[in-house]
């Protein structure tokens, strides 16, 4: 690997960097970026597509969630003006994405979080975004474990509501931090990032 000196953005006053995009600031910087080369898009300015987690400013506060950007070359990026396209959690960043229901089942109201993996699904003819989420514990404890949700889009801007696809369900299970998916030879292959704090 070679680190190119692009000189697009400085870091602590040093312009000799390979930084290609900066976040909006706030409580975080852009994070969890996933890039896809899209040869199907007729617009050369959208050949490279980027999904990332960032905090978007609003009148009252900041909203974390899915942000996207486009590039003709993978180096010079233009952020989409609408952000976030999918909001992380529901409401304020401190509000959990799952609220245990009366039956104490931790599988309601899925939302996205800050680990993202993109793929083009040739079977469904759409983009698929696999992201981390959080589930509450069966006893109601919040942010119990990490799990995986999926959202899809045909235009990379309008995304479906996240759908839970993989979650731990035993106290001794690890946590599911991310999922990279590819389609090959008629099969979907997922490479699961598992966290084990034991």
Where do the protein language model's features map onto the residues?
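Beta-rich carbohydrate-recognition and catalytic domains
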Residues: 1-174, 182-198
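The feature captures the catalytic groove of carbohydrate-active enzymes
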Residues: 177
